[in-house]
């Protein structure tokens, strides 16, 4: 039996109309049909929902006109599909679905044999409500009296109507006439549901103080500011008759059979009966109505009816005390969320004009700002490592930074400097250079944490920096602050020296990747003389462009596919080889990669004709393929004047629409496949057009050629970019790439020519930093004082008896080899933590046993064997069911995996992986603390505004009952009337009163106390890395959850993000239930993720990482 539930949901900015059905026989809920209403195309225009404080409406993209009526009319066919799914309970019965669909829409009337339907037991295929008589009142009924009620027995009606059919096939004209009773019901149903959805859209407003809920929250806020309790949960419970309701709910629960999957429906029905009894009170009393809403949410949370595979809830969640506790928390949280929302709108100065477009714009701006803040935190941590590694406070604070020079070690500073900069520095220049680096980070950090409209020009074009020194003036020691222009210091020479070296850096990259060993100067110059070519540091201006690795490997698959099973014939010629163990191929691959990023992408993603020709080719080819033409049918053509970036945004938005829907995963693959094919074909055409196909045929040079190579390079970067370049030099490649990607997304919305130019140059700066950012040390003496220091360091990772041989020393057994992983952990400050980790067990060190694993067998033979077996499976998929054959396949991939894990350990690559994992985890935590900083501003400034205070905060400040801070930095607190004056509570009694009221209000709401501020600081300042914090990474995640406890979604997101990061590193983690661990994160299992071979259902699989590596990571997460 089926029960239907209708709901309208607004999820991730997309409006859906959902049909859920519960099957009593199979005891599960399924989502029968989800009808998307927004972010679909109608008349080739994207539909969006636009909301403001007055209500919602459906609009077309880039238009504000209300088109709700027109769009809903266009969506009528989707309603017909919904009715079909509502009528037929077994979606797999195609004949019955075609029959019903033909009744509802003439253009869906297909040729159906009468016998194909009459042979079925029709009743078995009907939804439960149609198995017996159904009663309804037409919409135009004057009232709901008996005389207007219409009865339908669909099963009988269908049988009688089918008996009247005389021919072999259904006669739609006569059949529709006989089925008129059902058709009328369907039209009535669609009409009523259309009105319901329109009403839901109209009511989908952005919450405001004018709404019923908003007025209640506004009243609560006044009570809190007046030091009164906003609500009395006991009093509201009595008015609501909560005791009566809980008794009824528990009685319903106890009457149900064990494992009764319908119990949650029955509980909801009991609540609805209670609501009907007090309906008048709910209408008149806003507080009571809000209380009722929270009771509903409580049942939905603990006794859900829409969740697949749900379990029967716990009766303890129906106890009056438990409900009161949770509802009390929900109401308090609702006040907090309203404060945050109003604070956000006030901060962005859009309270009166707020709509969905402005909220979307804020979302984009905040995502970029938070990414920028994270970059500042990472850069400041690297600066701290250079100046004063054990500093626990904010190193960017001018006083703290000045004091750090008392502890600075010049030799260590110069060593750290050389890992970030190619230019040499002397001891005499250290102090000035340090202040210059601080000046490149601090102004950006202090400006961007305001989280309001920023002066991007000020961000990227900072001309000066400050230096604070103690000087003796008139016999007294005083702090004197001086200001320097970047263009008048050593930084100007450093900056232009790096700019001038760009062509040389490109040549060096070609030399290290063996390109110069296989291509002549003439051939390379041909690359650099492509029409309109100029070496670009911008790469692509289009977000979501596929990586070269994906383009090449997919291109290879298409070009070399088995002719017996053709996929798409894209007419490719350049993807001829895939032999990564071949030096010649690596040279070919590297040169193609350089052309792809430096030449192809900048042109392809800005040249409309070039991009459009590739899109047209792929779409035309798809239409010509018999049996496969539906793959890209949902993708429209590129318009004549449409920019590649605009078309890619459309494709990406279409792809994102489907990624949350399980049943449409295939369509996700189609969109991704389409994007890949456009770039694969585009790159192939670009290479052929510019006569660069010789790259496919590398030929060994007798002598490497690097003379007479001319690389044209021009940039508009100038003195104004020096400061931003300095900050970028303190970021790693991942941080730079992520920052650039966010910048590309954000800059798409810019209108001002000046702003676009500023962002373009900023992206060039990032490109420059990336070009030389990951340079490694060339000599072991750059990292170590002597061999003894090298040996002491390396013996943490490698057994001492192995240090005198390859790959740790050169063939002479004496000269140390610089390991890139060791270089990396020293550069970015994870050395202290990883040394502690590897010191915890000798098992983690490289041993002779690990070296021996590399020589057990020839891994190239194993790889060839796997490729051969895989080809056999492609030709004969049935082999996956042959146990002997699959065992052979499994053994081969086990051997390959064991070799790769041993190689990763021996070459210390796993040290680099652990470094990156540590940075990823700490960076994500720092990002969450940036969100907490933002929310502190929003909530505090809203409260200060309600107090009519003339002060506002711009960061999370300490609010202490016993000890008030007298002075605040200008980036912490400012005066609305005069932002330039120094703020001091000592000189302004009213400020002291305002801050006290702010503290009391936040304390009542359990927000942002000083204990949490300390946790926030430890995370934001990366204090874990200096090894003195006394917390494990897992405990830091607990601290982050504690800081964000004011928002349940954010709090839950913290632990989810830990799972996501570990997943991206090849591991799966499960935590012990929180109720068993006093709500602390405790690892239950940490194991490798599986890679499934021979299809998802095959038992043949391999682990992404080794079990030993999982143990290392588990120790890392729990180590203090």
Swiss-Prot record:
Record-annotated active site: 445, 450, 1016, 1021
UniProt keywords, alphabetically: Antiviral defense, Endonuclease, Hydrolase, Nuclease, Repeat, RNA-binding
Region named HEPN-like fold 1: 354-496
Manner of cofactor binding, per the entry note: Pre-crRNA processing is metal independent, while crRNA-guided target RNA cleavage is dependent on divalent metal.
One of the record's GO molecular function terms: RNA binding
Presence of keyword Cell inner membrane: no
InterPro entries the record matches: Cas13a_endoribonuclease (IPR053395)
Source organism superkingdom: Bacteria
EC number from the UniProt entry: 3.1.-.-
Cofactor entry: a divalent metal cation
Transmembrane segments: none
Region of interest called HEPN-like fold 2, as start-end residue ranges on this chain: 908-1120
One GO-annotated biological process of the protein: defense response to virus
Role played: CRISPR (clustered regularly interspaced short palindromic repeat), is an adaptive immune system that provides protection against mobile genetic elements (viruses, transposable elements and conjugative plasmids). CRISPR clusters contain sequences complementary to antecedent mobile elements and target invading nucleic acids. Unlike many single-component effectors, this CRISPR-Cas system targets RNA. CRISPR clusters are transcribed from pre-CRISPR RNA (crRNA) and processed into crRNA by this protein.
Domain notes: The target ssRNase active sites are probably within the 2 HEPN-like folds, and the 2 folds interact in vivo.
Family: Belongs to the CRISPR-associated endoribonuclease Cas13a family.
General remark: Part of a type VI uridine-preferring CRISPR-Cas system.
Protein name: CRISPR-associated endoribonuclease Cas13a
Lineage of the organism: Bacteria, Bacillati, Bacillota, Bacilli, Bacillales
């Amino acid at each position: 039996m089926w029960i239907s539930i209708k709901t309208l949901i607004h999820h991730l900015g997309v409006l859906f109309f959902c049909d859920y059905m519960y099957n009593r026989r199979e005891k599960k809920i399924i989502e029968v049909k989800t009808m998307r209403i927004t972010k679909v195309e109608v008349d080739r225009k994207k539909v969006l929902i636009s909301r403001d404080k007055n209500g919602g409406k459906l609009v077309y993209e880039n238009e504000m006109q209300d088109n709700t009526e027109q769009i809903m009319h266009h969506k009528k066919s989707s309603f017909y599909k919904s009715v079909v799914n509502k009528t037929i309970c077994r979606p797999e019965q195609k004949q019955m679905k075609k029959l019903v669909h033909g009744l509802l829409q003439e253009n869906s009337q297909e040729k159906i044999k009468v016998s194909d339907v009459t042979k079925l037991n029709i009743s078995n295929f009907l939804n439960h409500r149609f198995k017996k008589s159904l009663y309804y009142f037409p919409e135009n009924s004057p009232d709901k009296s008996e005389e207007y009620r219409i009865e339908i027995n669909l099963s009988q009606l269908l049988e009688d109507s089918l008996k009247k059919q005389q021919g072999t096939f259904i006669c739609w004209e006569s059949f529709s006439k006989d089925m008129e009773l059902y058709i009328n019901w369907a039209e009535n149903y669609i009409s009523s549901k259309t009105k319901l959805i329109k009403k839901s859209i109209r009511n989908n407003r952005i919450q405001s103080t004018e709404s019923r809920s908003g007025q209640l929250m506004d009243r609560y806020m006044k009570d809190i500011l007046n030091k009164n309790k906003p609500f009395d949960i006991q009093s509201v419970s009595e008015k609501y008759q909560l005791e009566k309701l809980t008794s009824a709910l528990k009685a319903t629960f106890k009457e149900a059979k064990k494992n009764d999957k319908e119990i949650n429906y029955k509980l909801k029905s009991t609540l609805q009966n209670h609501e009907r009894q007090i309906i008048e009170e709910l209408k008149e009393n806003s507080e009571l109505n809000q209380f009722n809403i929270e009771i509903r949410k409580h049942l939905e949370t603990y006794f859900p009816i829409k969740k697949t595979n749900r379990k029967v809830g716990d009766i303890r969640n129906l106890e009056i005390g438990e409900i009161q506790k949770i509802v009390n928390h929900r109401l308090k949280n609702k006040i907090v969320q309203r404060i945050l929302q109003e604070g956000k709108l006030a901060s962005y100065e859009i309270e009166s004009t707020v709509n969905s477009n402005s909220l979307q714009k804020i979302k984009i701006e905040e995502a970029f700002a938070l990414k920028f803040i994270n970059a500042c935190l990472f850069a400041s941590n690297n600066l701290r490592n250079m100046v004063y590694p054990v500093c626990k406070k904010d190193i960017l604070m001018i006083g703290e930074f000045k004091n750090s020079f008392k502890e600075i070690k010049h030799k260590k500073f110069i060593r750290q400097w050389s890992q970030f900069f190619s230019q040499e520095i002397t001891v005499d220049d250290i102090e000035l250079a340090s202040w210059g680096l601080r000046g490149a980070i601090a102004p950006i950090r202090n400006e961007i944490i305001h989280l309001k409209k920023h002066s991007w020009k000020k961000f990227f074009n900072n001309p000066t920096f400050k230096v604070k020194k103690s000087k003796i003036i008139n016999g007294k020691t005083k702090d004197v602050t001086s200001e320097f222009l970047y263009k008048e210091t050593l930084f100007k020479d450093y900056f232009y020296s790096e700019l001038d070296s760009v062509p040389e850096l490109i040549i060096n990259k070609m030399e290290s990747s063996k390109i110069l060993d296989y291509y002549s100067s003439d051939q390379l110059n041909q690359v650099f003389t492509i029409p309109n070519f100029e070496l670009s540091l911008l790469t692509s201006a289009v977000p979501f462009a596929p990586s070269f690795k994906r383009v090449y490997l997919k291109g290879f698959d298409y070009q070399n596919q088995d002719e017996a099973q053709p996929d798409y014939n894209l007419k490719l010629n350049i993807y001829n080889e895939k032999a990564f163990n071949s030096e010649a191929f690596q040279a070919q691959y590297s040169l193609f990669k350089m052309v792809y990023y430096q030449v192809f992408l900048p042109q392809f993603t800005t040249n409309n004709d070039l991009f459009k020709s590739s899109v047209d080719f792929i779409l035309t080819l798809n239409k010509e393929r018999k049996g496969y033409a539906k793959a890209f049918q949902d993708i429209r053509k590129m318009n004549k004047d449409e920019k590649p970036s605009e078309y890619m945004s459309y494709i990406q938005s279409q792809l994102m629409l489907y990624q949350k829907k399980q049943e449409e995963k295939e369509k996700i693959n189609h969109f991704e496949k389409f994007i890949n094919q456009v770039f694969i074909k585009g790159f192939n055409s670009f290479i052929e057009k510019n006569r660069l196909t010789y790259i496919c045929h590398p030929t060994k040079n007798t002598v490497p050629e690097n003379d007479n190579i001319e690389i044209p390079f021009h940039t508009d970067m100038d003195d104004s970019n020096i400061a931003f370049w300095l900050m970028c030099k303190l970021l790693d490649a991942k941080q730079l790439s992520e920052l650039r990607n966010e910048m590309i997304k954000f800059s798409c919305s810019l209108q001002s020519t000046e702003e676009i130019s500023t962002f373009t140059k900023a992206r060039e700066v990032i490109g420059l930093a990336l070009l030389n950012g990951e340079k490694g040390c060339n000599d072991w003496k750059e990292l170590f004082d002597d061999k003894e220091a090298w040996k002491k360091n390396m013996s943490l990772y490698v057994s001492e008896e192995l240090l005198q041989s390859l790959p740790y020393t050169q063939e002479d057994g004496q000269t140390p080899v610089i390991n890139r992983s060791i270089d990396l952990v020293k550069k970015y400050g994870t050395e202290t933590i990883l040394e502690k980790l590897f010191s915890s067990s000798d098992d983690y060190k490289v041993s002779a046993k690990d070296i021996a694993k590399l020589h057990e067998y020839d891994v190239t033979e194993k790889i060839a064997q796997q490729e051969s077996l895989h080809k056999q499976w492609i030709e004969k998929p049935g082999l996956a069911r042959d146990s002997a054959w699959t065992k052979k396949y499994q053994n081969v991939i086990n051997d390959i995996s064991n070799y790769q894990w041993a190689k990763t350990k021996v070459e210390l690559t796993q040290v680099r992986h652990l470094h990156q994992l540590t940075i990823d985890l700490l960076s994500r935590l720092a990002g969450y603390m940036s969100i907490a900083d933002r929310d502190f501003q929003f909530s505090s400034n809203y409260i200060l505004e309600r107090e009519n205070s003339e002060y506002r905060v711009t960061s999370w400040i300490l609010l202490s009952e016993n000890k008030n801070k007298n002075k605040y930095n200008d980036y912490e607190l400012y005066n609305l009337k005069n932002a330039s004056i120094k703020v001091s509570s000592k000189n302004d009694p009213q400020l002291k009163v305002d801050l006290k009221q702010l503290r009391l209000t936040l304390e009542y709401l359990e927000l942002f106390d000083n204990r949490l501020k300390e946790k926030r600081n430890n995370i934001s300042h990366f204090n874990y890395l200096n090894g003195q914090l006394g917390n494990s990474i897992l405990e830091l995640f607990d601290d982050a959850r504690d800081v964000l406890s004011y928002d349940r979604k954010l709090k839950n997101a913290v632990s989810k993000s830990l799972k996501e990061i570990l997943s991206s590193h090849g591991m799966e983690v499960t935590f012990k239930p929180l109720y068993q661990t006093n709500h602390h994160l405790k690892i239950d299992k940490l194991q490798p993720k599986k890679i499934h071979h021979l299809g998802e259902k095959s038992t043949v699989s391999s682990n992404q990482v080794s079990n030993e590596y999982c143990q290392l990571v588990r120790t890392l997460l729990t180590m203090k």
